[in-house]
Structures are given as structure tokens and as C-alpha cells.
Amino acid sequence: MNNENLGYTADEIKPEEQAEQTAPKWPYKVSVVIPVYNADDYLRSAMDTVLAQTLTEFELICVDDGSTDKSLEILESYAENDQRVTVMAMSHIGIGTARNKGLLKAKGEYIIFLDADDFYEPTLLEVLYNTAKEKNLDVVATGFDLYENKKERFIKSPEEEHGNIYADGAVASKNEYPDFILQSTTGYVWNKLFRTAFIQEKEIVFAPELYVFEDVYFVCCALSLADRVSRVYETLVHHRIYHQQHRARLFKKHSNQVPIVYLKVKEFLMRHGMYIPLSKSFLNFSASRCYKIFNLIPADKKDDFWDLLHNGYADSLGWYRHEVHDFEHHDVYDFAANIGLYTFDEYERLRLKGKLKNLKTMTLDALKKKIKQLQAKARVRERWNSLKGKIFGVFKKKPEQAEK
């Protein structure tokens, strides 16, 4: 084809190449990605608090995941009124894939993945972005609280066990803390800002096949490769939570996915040569999370979850390649050891037998204690009666006996 027909000669730079050279590498400071699925009850609150950010140089990419309510209509109305808003309408592809779509489209120097039913402090992006730039961070997390939707109250979020490695805004990484890095922050993605180039270079994406804890996988992958991680302690995200029954139903439906999440994390670590350096951190992270989830699962699903681990996943996760002292908590070690030794039915029989034995011991101990208490009372009563008899005996003596 003649170059003259294209409007430039062979010696000249193509217009699109010239535009690429003159355009900034990152047109936005931050890309905000929000996957949306049937969130019309709270979507406006999320959108309004994002668009009211004090840092204004951001793009908001909303990925509607085939909503059947008014979510898409709400998103389109915001896009009409604010040029920073982009709406991507998808079929029901799942939250992980929806986030990946937003990640592919992102043009911000940093990226954050928020939830469509949460709400945010106006300084969220400004504080995280400035902190990331000042400290040259790959990942920065913020403090958050939980908003109990039904009771309309805020609950302080629990501190992570090894969150102190970021005390006073310290910068940490897997190099300084290989035994703790995966437990140093939550597995939530919605309270973290990531450097986009870092995510792209390391090819970190959400696993589309995961229905729960897809953000845990993403966060673990990022923490395992990041050179500079920190956090701010301001509460900038308000995460909406619902009643316990809602959570129980979620675990009941998808509990079989939990070991798969951690196995995928292990596979990622192995591909990148990070499993051996972070093996102790991965052990305690995966075992303690599985133990916690086991305790949250409804009683009628505990056996499935237990036997899933017993029949291969616990071994695949590497739990039995460690010594007792590698486990940070005895109850987590007991959980992992019992899974390796027993099926759920066998474990339950032993547990109930142990409870019965403890009950018998407690009953016998209580009986002995009660007997001792009664005996002590009887001795006190005897001494009192004896003393009382002596006192009254003096007054009952005849006058002449008293004179003598």
C-alpha cells in the first residue's frame, strides 16, 4: 500500500506512534475498578463516595457482570454525567473475570479494586496514592471497619497477627519477613492500592474459576513478589457486612472451593520460585485460614470440608512436610494433624469420646469438690457448736459453783 494514502511517508513517524510518544505513560494517577452484580440497593453510595474523592485524577471502570436489577441503568446514568466513568457491560462472567476485564482496560499508574456495596472516605485515593509515591511501593493497604448493615453500626476490624511489621508506616517485603509476609495483611483486595506496572509485569490476575476468596489468591500473589509493601492506619474503607446466615450460606455453598484457592496460591509460588522461601508463611496462612473457615461452616457441611482436606488437599498443601514447631498455634497444628490421621467420622467419635471422658472427670472432680466443701462446713459447724456449748455452759452454772 502507498504510504501517501496513509497521510505520511516511510521516513516519517506514524501519527499513532507519535501520539504514543507524546502521551503520558499513565493518563491517570489511579484506576478504580468496581465489578457490579445486582447491587442497585447500595451502588449509588459506592459511586458517590468514589466520585467525591479529593484526588480527582482517576478513572472509574465499572464492570457490570450481567445484572438483572437496575445496576446497569444506574451505572450508565453516572457515565453520562462524569467523563471519568467507563461502563463495561458483560454477561455473567464471575467477579474474578470482571475484575480482570477492568485490569486490562486500566490506564492508571496505580489500581484499586473496590466493591459495589461498600462506601469510602473522600481521602482514600489521595492518602494511598501519596503514600505509594513517597515510599515507592508496589502495594499499600489501608485501615477499614465493618458496617453491620442490619443494625446500622460500625465494627472495628480485627488486626492481622503480623500486621506490626508495618508499624509506624514501615516498608516491608518477603525478603525481610519470609515467615510472616502472607499473614501480615488481610486477603481482601478492596483495601489495597497496587502499582499497575508491577501487576502487569508479574502477570498477576484473578483466577476466573474461583467463586470465593478470589481476592485472597490475587493478594497472596502480589505479596509474594512485591519488593515494597506498607500500610496506612487511617480507616478509609467501610465494608458492608450482612447477617451471619448470609455468610453461613456462602460457606455452605462454596466451602469446597477454599482448599482450591490455597492450592492455586501454592502453584503460583512454585512457578515463581517463591514456595521454598515462603513455605512457613504459606503453611501458617493456609492452615490457620482453613481452621478458621472450618469453624464457620455450618455443621452439616463440616464433614465434606474436613474429608476434602483429609483425602488429599492437606497433603498437597504441604502441611505434613513441616515440624510441629513450624506451626505458630497449637490448635491449628492439632487441626492439621487430626485431618491427616482421621476421617471426619473417626475424628467426631474420638472427640465425643474425649468429651464424655472429660465430662466424667469433671463430674467426679465436681463431686469431690462438693464433698470437701460439705465436710469443711460440717467441721466449722462442729467447732461452732462446741464453742457455743462451752459459752452457754458457763452461764448455766449454779451461782455457788460460779463463786467457787
Give the positions of each predicted feature.
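Cell-envelope/extracellular polymer assembly enzymes that use nucleotide-activated donors
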Residues: 28-31, 59, 217
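Glycine-rich, basic loop-to-helix element that forms the pyrophosphate-binding segment
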Residues: 90-106
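Donor-binding/catalytic cores of nucleotide-activated saccharide
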Residues: 95, 116-232, 237-255
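Short aromatic/hydrophobic "clamp" motif used to bind/position activated sugar donors
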Residues: 111
